[in-house]
């Protein structure tokens, strides 16, 4: 059973991601993460973070961005640092956190304590607690979060453990694993605290793990006509969901890692280059830049693509 469940959200090592210019020095610290061996929050894990350019954004303190990597993804791999550099460039103390993401069996009972370990507002040794204690952080301005695959689950659950989490951008996740017919009710909208108009999720149409419109709608809270590729909040704040079509990325296959130029059209693969329609300066509604711009407004304003895509 473990070997089957491992396939749900396994992310391989990213190679040669065409990252944006790195801004600033990467600093490190540690926090106490959830330890499945003791069922307690006593597993020392690492945090890496960058500060904004003080010439542009002032001396701080700054609002906080937190990125959670996917299964088997390391917290400082090129994908994680792409997010960190981009959010530091938007005026955030931008951090990426390691957690126990190597365990094969992944269910709500394992996801929820991992998320609590990262975001818990009541524990000074959580990742959020450590970051918010920094003289460079002002968490009263707000925390925003993002993550891919299992990391997307962490981000969606974040506000359940920390009311300072104001907006979330999640990638490649839903409430149902197609390959093993496993449901994740913990991330369904009735069970999450984050308002639906502060959540954006972008998935690939050919994702063999978390694909499908209904499982995505269950997490988002927004429902559109069957066959829709995008669905946005009626209040115009830019929250909602997007399903990237196979024709929209360079490789012609929008799998679990649609944001990478994956060799061989393998929907399971997460090894490759950053897809040019996802990386900056691409400005589609599913591209990285516009979604991080939306996140930087704490989920209140989106600049929609003039192409409609």
Range-by-range predicted roles:
Residues 60-70:
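Short beta-strand element of the alpha/beta-hydrolase
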Residues 20-60:
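N-terminal cap/lid segment of alpha/beta-hydrolase-fold proteins
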Residues 228-309:
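C-terminal catalytic histidine-bearing segment of alpha/beta-hydrolase fold enzymes
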Residues 167-247:
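The feature captures the conserved acid-bearing segment of alpha/beta-hydrolase catalytic domains
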Residues 111-136:
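Alpha/beta-hydrolase active-site loop
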Residues 77-95:
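Short amphipathic alpha-helix adjacent to the substrate-entry channel of hydrolases
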Residues 72, 98-119:
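Cap/lid segment of the alpha/beta-hydrolase catalytic domain
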Residues 129-194:
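Primarily recognizes the serine-hydrolase "nucleophile elbow" in alpha/beta-hydrolase
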């Amino acid at each position: 059973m473990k070997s089957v469940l491992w396939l749900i959200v396994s992310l391989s090592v990213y190679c040669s991601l065409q990252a944006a210019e790195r801004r600033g020095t990467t600093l490190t610290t540690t926090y106490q993460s959830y330890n499945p061996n003791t069922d307690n929050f006593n597993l020392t894990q690492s945090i890496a973070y960058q500060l904004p350019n003080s010439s542009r954004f002032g001396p701080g303190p700054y609002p906080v961005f937190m990125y959670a990597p996917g299964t088997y993804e390391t917290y400082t791999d090129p994908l994680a640092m792409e997010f960190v550099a981009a959010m530091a460039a938007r005026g955030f103390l931008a951090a990426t956190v390691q957690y126990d993401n190597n365990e094969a069996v992944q269910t709500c009972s394992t996801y929820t304590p991992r998320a609590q370990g990262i975001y818990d507002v009541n524990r000074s040794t959580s990742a959020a607690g450590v970051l918010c204690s920094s003289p460079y952080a002002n968490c009263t301005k707000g925390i925003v979060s993002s993550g891919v695959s299992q990391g997307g689950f962490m981000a969606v659950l974040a506000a359940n453990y920390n009311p300072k989490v104001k907006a979330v951008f999640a990638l490649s996740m839903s409430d149902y694993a197609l390959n093993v017919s496993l449901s994740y009710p913990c991330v369904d909208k009735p069970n999450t605290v984050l308002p639906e108009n502060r959540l954006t999720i972008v998935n690939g149409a050919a994702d063999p793990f978390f694909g499908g419109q209904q499982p995505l709608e269950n997490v988002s809270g927004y429902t559109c006509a069957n066959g829709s590729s995008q669905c946005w909040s009626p209040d115009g704040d830019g929250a909602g969901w997007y399903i990237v079509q196979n024709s929209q990325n360079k490789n012609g296959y929008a799998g679990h890692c649609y944001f990478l130029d994956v060799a061989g059209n393998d929907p399971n693969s997460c090894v490759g280059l950053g897809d040019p329609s996802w990386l900056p300066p691409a400005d589609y509604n599913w591209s990285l830049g516009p979604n991080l711009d939306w996140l930087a407004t704490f989920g209140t304003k989106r600049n929609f693509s003039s192409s409609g895509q």
